Amino acid sequence: MTKESIPKELLKLITGEEIMMFQELRIRIQELNYKTNLTRLIEGDDYWISQVYDSLWTFKENSKKIFDNKKFIDIGSGCGFPGFAYAITHPNSEIYLVDSSKKKTDSLKEIIKRMNFKNNIFVINDRIENVGRQSSFKKSFNIATARAVSNPSTVAEYILPMLEQNGLGILYCGKWRNEDNKNLENTLNVLEGKIMEIKSKSLPKEKGIRNVIFIKPKASCPDIFPRSIGKAEKYPLKG
């Protein structure tokens, strides 16, 4: 793909070197896609807008927050977005990609092996409920993201226990209603967290509306969270 075919909105956010990395990443995902079915969003604007731009605008258009040199965890990483996108554009950060599918984590490891990432990138094949109860990971991350994983209240229970006191959680959502806002606030009250900001963006090329919710701890998250496997999804916290 030529530089000219990459959407201009994305060209404003990334360097020439980063463009080449994203081009190579697309090829690596394509190579593995046929046997793992990592994603259908791999061609043209589906890749450059729905994957790359959608992952990056949150970090690149928010000048008030510093995202470099962080310990970062991507929950439910799937084909590697936003984790790989963050890794390419923030090469001094330490990256953890978590997914419960062994096929997907094996593919993520293979992509890392084939590419020349500058970061230390670690892939974890486990449920986030198990990862979040390990003392080596609990309350240790500066940034935690989740994209297209589950409802916001469930995702908040995955994210908050991973964050250190000044950490930032980033939830990528499609539609966002007043009811979602109320439910998330109730959940965060239990988790000793709060909503910092909600940003909405119309993605280029009519790729839809994206809402990004920034959350953070207001006190130490109780050690009983996250609950055991499936509890957060089946019984979301209601406050």
UniProtKB/Swiss-Prot annotation:
S-adenosyl-L-methionine binds at G76, F81, D99, S100, S101, I128, E129, R147. Its main location: cytoplasm. The keyword Methyltransferase applies. Signal peptide: none annotated. It is found in: Cytoplasm. Its EC number is 2.1.1.-. Keywords: Cytoplasm, Methyltransferase, rRNA processing, S-adenosyl-L-methionine, Transferase. The keyword Hydrolase does not apply. It comes from the Bacteria. One of its GO terms (cellular component) is cytosol. GO terms for molecular function: rRNA (guanine-N7-)-methyltransferase activity. Belongs to the methyltransferase superfamily. RNA methyltransferase RsmG family. Specifically methylates the N7 position of a guanine in 16S rRNA. This is Ribosomal RNA small subunit methyltransferase G. The lineage of its organism: Bacteria, Bacillati, Cyanobacteriota, Cyanophyceae, Synechococcales.
